[in-house]
Amino acid sequence: MHLPNVLQARFVQALEPLTDSPSDYAGMIRPAADPKFGDYQSNAAMPLAKRVGKTSRDVAAELVQNLNVTDLFEEPEVAGPGFINLRLKDSVLFDSIQQMLLDERVGVSKTTDPKKVIVDFSSPNVAKPMHVGHIRSTVIGDCLARTLRFYGEDVVTDNHLGDWGTQFGIIIYGYRNFGDPAKVAANPVPELSALYRLTNQLIEYQKAKQSLATMADKLATAKSDAKTAKEVSDQSESDENLKPKDKKKLRKNAEAATRRVASIEADMKSLKAKIDAVDSDTELSKLASEHSDVDVAVLRETAKLHEGDPENLALWKEFLPHCQDEINRIYDRLNVQFDHTLGESFYHDRLAGVVDHLTTLGLTTKSDGAICVFLEGFDSPMIIQKRDGAFLYATTDLATLQYRRDEFQPDEILYVVDSRQGEHFKKFFAMAEPLGMAEVQLVHVNFGTVLGPDGRPMKTRSGSLIGLESLLNDAVSRAKEVVCNPDRLATMDPPMGGEEQQQIAEIVGIGAIKYADLSHHRTSDYKFDVDKMVALEGNTATYVQYSYARTQSILRRASDGEGLPAFEQAIEQAAATQPMTFTHPNERSLALMLMRFEEAIEQVRLNYAPNALCDYLFETAKTYSSFNESCRVLGNDDPAVMQTRLALVVLTGRVLKKGLSLLGIDVAERM
């Protein structure tokens, strides 16, 4: 039962005699912050009182008089300035727990009006190894797809791979100039990855040298500005004619100028690291000298590929499957699957048609030789074809949108892409209406950046993005140290062998990285800290997984060799036929928390917010821990009490397991 939705409907009825817009206030219902205020609380009376010219307590009293909830709640109470406190009847809690136990969906209702939803996520460039920057789109998109599917939506997942363009120009150039065909044929994945890294390093080296030459002047200007801003701020402190707010503004200006200097210095440090990595290596330095125009040469190879050059096209067809195998290996580790992997190459032959179609509609304009679409409300146009004839990402996105409309007829498309692409998506979505797709809801599910310990985007010392596989390996290694340490292993009965230890470390380590990402609000940045991620304390996957394992440990002991499936079925039958009872506040707290599972699922669905589910699972695990410490389950003298507590343990395990599965995280049966 989704209690907030039920309450909202009841409050609409109670509010109708008091206002013409009851829906404006009916949703002001929240779980109570403290059990002494009940289970749910409404503050609707406060804002409504201002509108109707009464005291908030009087309005609250009228609402309580009109409110018909005694079939579910004890008599509502008015507290403080006009809060309405509601405490659920224990009998309703018992019924809900019984129903959840008998329901394979653990009480989460399915939509009666399913929509076709396309979730576009991950989308790496397949020519290079996946890196830390790919983790957010991959795990957020996977979680949303799993949750929407569970809710009953008709979900189609699509990995819009970067399998065309410059990245393959880099590999082709690297293969032609540095590659050994025999080595590539014998061991394609590592050899192609190495060729990409080498060629790209030379490109980045040349770019870094060019950028560093201009940044010295920027730094000098920034330092001068910072010095001036500080002097002005310092002088203002003794100026009695200046208002405090003006002094504060000058201080902030000085601080911002100082941060600007620090930012430029950090960028210069990163550029110098890229340069030093090449200059300090004799072989790399020689290659950089011999291939000083590598960036231009790569663009030539890319252009030849786009034009259908037989040799480059043959190399692309040879290399692509190996590149896809490499990223699929990472997806297998992450337990992420896609319905479709239609990359940029799939749409290449459609791009000219997109430009022609937009031109026919009268939407295009030539500007400096490029074909553009000028959109109302935007300062700059959307460029769909450059003056040299090359197409852009925007053109591919438009071709993709047309294909998806014709092939899938979606109601909604979610683009799980980082926040830096916000302007692109605003323009792209603005194109939907003139293309006749205004009825499709397009959503940019944006997200922040993974940061290193220094608070900047996470990179290696040389300035490269850190490989995703190395992060996964590190997390698994640390997880094994935490959950398979000798003290813990000594308590395991039966003993835990090496293979099981490695399986659990993999489950915990991969889960830790996923959960750490999903537990943050998706639009915020977060610092990557593997030690915190695998910790057994705090809001971590490890803590939630351990809580699940504790439920299974109790049930194994209680089943006395009967086997968990049969034992849990017996618990279900007993809960359906025998009365439940609460003898401790922590029993009731756990039951109430379990009832709120559907509310957490709804937050993920409505707000594309996986962190709401993480928060719920963490709170459930904490509530279960309190229950476990204060409420003896096994060997209780009162059969009714033991039966109730066993039912709560079974349901806690199911809710934690299902919740983690929606996050894309596995569980271990023992830890």
Curated annotation (Swiss-Prot):
PANTHER family: ARGININE--TRNA LIGASE, CYTOPLASMIC, ARGINYL-TRNA SYNTHETASE. It comes from Rhodopirellula baltica (strain DSM 10527 / NCIMB 13988 / SH1). PROSITE patterns: AA_TRNA_LIGASE_I (PS00178). The keyword Amino-acid biosynthesis does not apply. SUPFAM superfamilies: Anticodon-binding domain of a subclass of class I aminoacyl-tRNA synthetases (SSF47323), Arginyl-tRNA synthetase (ArgRS), N-terminal 'additional' domain (SSF55190), Nucleotidylyl transferase (SSF52374). The gene is argS. It catalyses: tRNA(Arg) + L-arginine + ATP = L-arginyl-tRNA(Arg) + AMP + diphosphate. Residues 224-233 have a biased composition (Basic and acidic residues). Pfam families: Arg_tRNA_synt_N, DALR_1, tRNA-synt_1d. This is Arginine--tRNA ligase. Keywords: Aminoacyl-tRNA synthetase, ATP-binding, Cytoplasm, Ligase, Nucleotide-binding, Protein biosynthesis. Its main location: cytoplasm. Belongs to the class-I aminoacyl-tRNA synthetase family. A motif ('HIGH' region) lies at residues 124-134. It is found in: Cytoplasm. HAMAP family: Arg_tRNA_synth (MF_00123). GO terms for cellular component: cytoplasm. CDD domains: Anticodon_Ia_Arg, ArgRS_core. SMART domains: Arg_tRNA_synt_N (SM01016), DALR_1 (SM00836). Monomer. Residues 223-254 are annotated as: Disordered.
